[in-house]
Every structure is written in C-alpha cells, then in structure tokens.
Amino acid sequence: MTDIHIQDGDLSSLKDKVVVITGGSSGIGLATTNLLLDLGAKVVIGDLQPPTTRVDSERCSFHKVDVTVWSDQLTLFKEARELHGRIDHVFANAGVGPKADYLSTALDQNGDLVEPTFLTLDVNLKAVIYTATIACYYMREEQQSPAGGSIVIVSSVAGVSRFRAVDYATAKHGNLGFARGLHQRLTAENSPTRVNLIAPSWTNTGFMPPQIMAAVGVEPQEPASVGRAAAYLMADDSRKGQMIHIAKGRYREVEESIMLPAAEKVVDVENGGVMEDDTLAKIIETMGIFKAKATQ
C-alpha cells in the first residue's frame, strides 16, 4: 500500500477545467468546490439547496437537482454544457447517512411489517449510477482530449469492510462494484474516460454530531482533506480504476495495491485460476465470432 503525497503542483492542470459536482453545496462537495475554484476551475453544482456558505466566484453556478430523479440529472448536465461548452470532470458526491432499520418490528395500519426505506440506496447508489452514466455519454459524445474526462465516485471505508449501518454499507459496496465494472467496460472499449473512487474514513460532514465523535475518542478529518484527493484523481490522468483511502490527511491507493491482489488470491491465479472478467472477455469475443459466422 503506497502513500500518495499530493503537492499543489499536482493539481495545476485543473485550471479552466469544467467540473460537475453532485451534492456540492455542503461537506466534502463544498470543500471540493472551493478547492477547484481556487485552482481556477469552473464548477457546476447540482444539489437540493444552494451552498451553505457563500461561494464568491463567477466560475461557480448552482442548479437545483434531486439526484434521484433521472430527468433532473439530465438537465444538470445539459445546462453545464450550455454554460461552458464541455464537461471535463464529474464528481459523484451526493450522499446521505443510513436511514433503514432492517430489524424493525414497526407495523402499518393493517398490522403488516412496514417496508424499509430505500432513500440511502437511492441517493448513495442509484443516483451515483445515474451521474456516471450521463457523464460517460457526454464525455464520449464530446471526444474531448486524448486524456479524456474523468469520473470520481465517493465510496467509503464502509464499502470495503463490515459496517452495521446496513443500507449505507450496501450502497458504498455497490459504488465500488459499479466503478470496478465501469472501469473494465471503458478499458475494453479503449475509452479515454477514467473512473476512480475515494474512500474516506470518518469526516466532519454532519453525518454524526461532533460531541458524539469526541465522546468515543474519534477526531473526524476535515472535508478539505477529502476534496484534495478527489481533485488529485481528476488531475492525474494516469489514475485509472483506482481508489484512494483518506484518513486524517493521509492518502493511500488501496484498490490496485491491496484489494485486486486479494481477489487474485481468492481465485488462486498463481496456480492457474482465471479471473471472472478474463473469462467473460473470452465469452464476448467468442460470441462475436459465432455471430459474424452466422451472418456470412
């Protein structure tokens, strides 16, 4: 696991870039917005409410968006391109805390078990898929530069570990799975669009009251530390299919250095095991050959 040391110069390429951020009005999203503006980027925020603090820049625009609504996100991207002519980077950041209790015994007026809420899964997973899907469309359509655009997705340490906030953990595991699969598809199609993730540890975003965190002896990191990792993944076009873990200002790449090697051990690649995606690639190729022969 390699530590990453992010220097100010590493982010300089973001000057004049156009970045769409969902959930950019508070927490990690707002911290990232402010950093990008300081770097000279142009930021388009999609959120339910305007920024919680004044963002004093003509290069930042706010658009009221419910990220769980497909048409709202479509409008966000359309307006971003109308404003700036292109979209260079997308930060799929909008999220909420855990909401569902899968052990609840609450009954409705008919005496039946109450359906659990899907709000956290809708915001933290479904909406992220919406954001990335639309981002891929715009980046592919515009055929920007050879370096391509990039998508950064917010996962969490809860997405790689056991975490008893079940709906939140499920969504964050889903973020990782979605990004992994999307990276493989983009790579297979030789697309220049990059997808990466960040996995922050406890961060001061209002997820938990500060007095509670202090009582359990945990000092959350500031959102600005997390935003710096997101900006770094946008700026460094060598970063593809990676995930940066952030804890108290320390940055470490964990997908390629830890988790993928662990998967290879599960499959036992060293002793002839074959990764599932390698098999799927051969299946797709073989089906294409059969289809071509059938049409001859």
From Swiss-Prot:
Induction: Expression is induced on AF medium. InterPro entries: NAD(P)-bd_dom_sf, SDR_fam. SUPFAM superfamilies: NAD(P)-binding Rossmann-fold domains. One of its GO terms (molecular function) is oxidoreductase activity. GO terms for biological process: terpenoid biosynthetic process. NADP(+) binds at I28, D66, N93, Y168, K172, T205. Disulfide bonds: none annotated. Ascofuranone is a specific inhibitor of trypanosome alternative oxidase (TAO), and quickly kills African trypanosomes in vitro and cures infected mice. As an essential factor for trypanosome survival, TAO is a promising drug target due to the absence of alternative oxidases in the mammalian host. It catalyses: ascofuranol + A = ascofuranone + AH2. Keywords: NADP, Oxidoreductase. Its EC number is 1.1.99.-. Signal peptide: none annotated. Pathway: Secondary metabolite biosynthesis; terpenoid biosynthesis. The keyword NADP applies. The active site is at S155, Y168, K172. Belongs to the short-chain dehydrogenases/reductases (SDR) family. Short-chain dehydrogenase/reductase; part of the asc-2 gene cluster that mediates the biosynthesis of ascofuranone, a strong inhibitor of cyanide-insensitive alternative oxidases and a promising drug candidate against African trypanosomiasis. The first step in the pathway is performed by the non-reducing polyketide synthase ascC that produces orsellinic acid by condensing acetyl-CoA with 3 malonyl-CoA units. Orsellinic acid is then prenylated by the prenyltransferase ascA to yield ilicicolinic acid B. Ilicicolinic acid B is further reduced to ilicicolin B by the reductase ascB. This is Short-chain dehydrogenase/reductase ascJ. It comes from Acremonium egyptiacum. The gene is ascJ.
